[in-house]
Amino acid sequence: MAIPSVISSLVTVVYNMADTFFVGQTGDALQVAAVSLTNPIFILLMAFANMFGMGGSAIISVALGENNHQSVKKISSFISWASLVIGAAFAAVLLCFTAPILHLFGADTSTFEFARGYTVYIAFGAPFVIWSAAASFVVRAEGASKEAMIGSMIGTIANIILDPVFVSGLGQGAAGAAIATTIGNMLAALYYLWYFLKKSRRFSLAPKDALCGTHIAVRVCSVGFPTAIFSALMCVSTIVLNLILVAYGNAPVAAIGIVFKANMFITFLQMGLANGVQPIFGYSYGAGDIKRFADTERFTKLCCFVVGLAATALYFFLREPIIGLFVDDSGVITYGVQMLIAYMLSGPFIGFLFVNMNCMQSVGRALPATVLSVLRQGLLLIPLLYLLNAVFGLNGAVLGQSITDYVTIALSCVVWRRIRR
């Protein structure tokens, strides 16, 4: 079950890398910097998607283990309609307040127009981004991992095909990358719509099922809240880091955007393993099969460590070619190589955090997972970024994420061990 999830995660990585890669082929570091500055927008969209998708999939897995098919219908319908409504509201805010939002993110006169073009088109795709991502989690919870993977691949393949057409062929640059992303998410959303209506016998899109009262809504959101907080605070910390780096010029901003995308391979590879087995965690807990739960946890952590170590080693030896693949600018490449080394220091062990958090969510212990998310992307990371920048400058600031990762990994192991007892 985890293999399609891993493939879906890698597809997501390729999806996110595509925009930066094709914009980088324009040879304009300012456009790469502009796309980097808008990263928080996509991260925030994924925060909502993760809240509905991860929360819903965990509750659906438990409901399936209990053979409660009526709850599955209500949860799936609620997730779908909530995703579309939140996406539409998010788009309205982006379109109405584009300029102040981008200035808050650190855009200046040289990057603003590029960032604005990208943001406007991403806004139009917001409902589809949220629902297609949330639906992939829900479909996987039903045991249809292959179908979830297909949905992700449809959006990614479309994006990869359309990126060069809009970015270079039609000369739209950064805005063209956003157009391709929006169309890709629309196609993925159409596929999941087909699955809900024609393939699944348990899911529902009926509005009457979505109006399920506050009980299911609270359960979904509370379980998915740790993952959503993880993404939302990642948005805030990304903005903070961008604002710190802007003081050193646009080259470090462009470099960190590339490093974020490149490092996603290491992170999402392990996140895919953890997410792929979450239905097993939920089903095993719902059915009272504690041995299966524990065996799955141990095996998943071992897999995360092995693939994390291998990916980190690969990145270390190929660090300069990896950054150079995205942009042909010596200044950006120099910054990027240094930043990539700093970010991949926690690569072999970050999967332990994801597995521990998923275990906590699957047994209904959302609060500890929420606290860990807040620490990793907020309460610990953001002050640390400012402190390290003040003491060690740019080189210190880019070490903040890896230091925070190791602290939260250790805490998650201690907390989950106590819960498991």
Report residues per predicted region.
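N-terminal transmembrane alpha-helices
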Residues: 1-21, 25-26, 40-55, 59, ...
